[in-house]
């Protein structure tokens, strides 16, 4: 059945994996909502998608702010009449040894990755319950299994996995599936910001010896958002080139 004529709200979708996911969804006939905290990036992405003939809406919002999230959801429903798919993609990382991490590092990492996922899901779920249909896909990370120097990020993403499982149980009888994708090393702006020596070290521990691409994530999200994936819920799908086979 696909996702044609469905409405997808994708957070953090003005760049990287989120943008590629929004593009894949739009190419499959969905109306997409581009969200980011950066208004200029949102505007540029909306213009790009519109020029390709896609149905698109821009929503500038800080997903860690309840009022902003509620406003974004209202904006989406006012424009398209409903929300069928939510992809909680927005995320960020503050890495470092435990002794060097500040309270602010912890707070911002939890706020964006975990609280933002909670607020967005809470804001859309009632609408999905009314429609007796919904696809919610959360982006975790292979890092939820733990990684040195990733205490805030690993904690946040482990929370996302726990939230995914709890909500799959709570919302299943309402026709809503809740799943989680755990990417490994993906070629995104976050990757490009890493020092070359860190990139080489990480790739040396990658079974495939190479990075994944945003389209690898987008295709997995497309599968989970599809109407035909209604019997898949509460799952964590690793898209990591085998990296999850190894600890640390």
UniProtKB/Swiss-Prot annotation:
Keyword NAD: yes
Keywords annotated in UniProt: NAD, Oxidoreductase
InterPro entries: NAD(P)-bd_dom_sf, Sc_DH/Rdtase_CS, SDR_fam
Enzyme class, spelled out: oxidoreductase
Induction info: Induced by toluene.
Ways its activity is controlled: Activity is probably regulated by the inactive BbsC subunit.
Binding site for NAD(+): 15, 36, 62-63, 89, 153, 157
Pfam families: adh_short_C2
Signal peptide: none
Pathway involvement of the protein, from the record: Xenobiotic degradation; toluene degradation
Any one Gene Ontology molecular-function term assigned to this protein's record: oxidoreductase activity, acting on the CH-OH group of donors, NAD or NADP as acceptor
Residue ranges of coiled coil: none
Influence of pH: Optimum pH is 6.2.
Catalytic activity: (2S)-[(R)-hydroxy(phenyl)methyl]succinyl-CoA + NAD(+) = (S)-2-benzoylsuccinyl-CoA + NADH + H(+)
UniProt-listed GO biological process terms: fatty acid elongation; toluene catabolic process
UniProt-listed Enzyme Commission number(s): 1.1.1.429
Annotated active site: 153
Record NCBIfam families: PRK07231.1 (NF005559), PRK12826.1-2 (NF009466)
Family named by the database record: Belongs to the short-chain dehydrogenases/reductases (SDR) family.
Record function comment: Involved in an anaerobic toluene degradation pathway. Active subunit that catalyzes the oxidation of 2-(alpha-hydroxybenzyl)succinyl-CoA to 2-benzoylsuccinyl-CoA. In vitro, can catalyze the NADH-dependent reduction of the artificial substrates 2,2-dichloroacetophene and 2,4'-dichloroacetophenone.
Subunit organization: Heterotetramer composed of 2 inactive BbsC subunits and 2 active BbsD subunits.
Protein name: (2S)-[(R)-hydroxy(phenyl)methyl]succinyl-CoA dehydrogenase subunit BbsD
Organism: Thauera aromatica
Organism placement in taxonomy: Bacteria, Pseudomonadati, Pseudomonadota, Betaproteobacteria, Rhodocyclales
